[in-house]
Every structure is written in C-alpha cells, then in structure tokens.
C-alpha cells in the first residue's frame, strides 16, 4: 500500500483518511485497500472522507483530527464549493461522525501549495499541543479554540510559515498517529 503519513489518523481502532488513498493505489480495488488497511494497521474501522479540492497533498491532517471516538475537529470548509461541502457532510453523516469546526484560513493563500492558515495540522503530545501559527489575524482565535478543546494541555505555538510554504505543517513532518 502507498500511504502518506499525513493521510492516516488512527484513534482507538479507527483510521481516518481521505479518498487520496484510492488515487495513490489505483492498482487495487477500494475494497482491497480497505481490507489491507484493516489488516496491516490492526483496525476495526476505516473511514474515508473526500479530500479538499485543490489541496495537492489530499491529506487528512489538513482537513480533520480526532477529538474522540465519535467526534472530529474539522477545518471549516465555509470557503469551499457547495458540491464538496455536500459530499463531505454526507460522508460524515454516513460514518456517524460528529464534528467541531476550527478556523481555516488557507483560502487566503495566493496558491494552493501553501498550508498557511491550516490549524488541524498540529502535534498532540501527552501534555502539550505543538500548534502551528502564521502571524495572521486568525491565529489567536484558533489557539483559543484548541485551548478550549484541550484544557489540560499546554498550548505551544510554533511559527510555521517556512514549513507551510511547501504544503505541509507539523503533523505532516512527524508521521504521528
């Protein structure tokens, strides 16, 4: 299986990925890909959501993060086209996933390579959240949202523009599950 680290989030026997997994493994059927994921990663369930249009990585860590078994943190898709939002919400409903929105200002980028403004791409440690910031207005609102969701964890802002300009952020470079 071809699988990028940024496109696989595992939480309590469940894996969250985007449909990029199917594109990267065209030589296999969707059913076979799901079977291999379950077997290889020792999963009970594989959840596939549509990747964000024009996101050249197609990774899940630019779209969502697990909060608990039934809830994800979701980059607010307010600036995406209606067909995508419909497909995304339909997928979430089908999988019986709840979601909480977080700021998403990637639409401010002049190109679709930069991940500047993406706040789901953080690293979660036992007692800390290493959180990407970009020196833009939405940073503070996103940090406040994360602090409310993880009140027992120390929030450590990491200036991330240099990493973001190549399309990735903190979680991307860690392959943390």
How would you name each of these model-derived features?
Residues 1-177:
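Histidine/cysteine-enriched polar flanking segments
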């Amino acid at each position: 299986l071809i699988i990028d680290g940024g496109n696989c989030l595992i939480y309590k026997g469940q894996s969250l990925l985007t449909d990029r997994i199917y594109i990267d493994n065209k030589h296999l059927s969707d059913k076979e890909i799901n079977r291999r994921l379950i077997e290889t990663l020792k999963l009970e369930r594989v959840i596939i959501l549509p990747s964000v249009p024009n996101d050249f990585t197609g990774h899940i860590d630019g779209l969502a993060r697990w909060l608990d078994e039934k809830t994800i943190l979701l980059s607010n898709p307010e600036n995406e086209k209606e067909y995508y939002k419909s497909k995304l919400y339909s997928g979430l409903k089908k999988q019986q996933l709840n979601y909480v929105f977080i700021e998403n200002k990637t639409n401010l980028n002049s190109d679709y390579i930069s991940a500047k403004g993406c706040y789901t791409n953080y690293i979660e440690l036992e007692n800390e959240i290493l959180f990407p910031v970009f020196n833009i207005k939405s940073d503070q609102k996103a940090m406040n949202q994360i602090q409310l969701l993880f009140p027992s964890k120390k929030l450590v802002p990491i200036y991330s523009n240099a990493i973001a300009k190549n399309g990735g952020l903190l979680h991307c470079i860690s392959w943390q599950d």
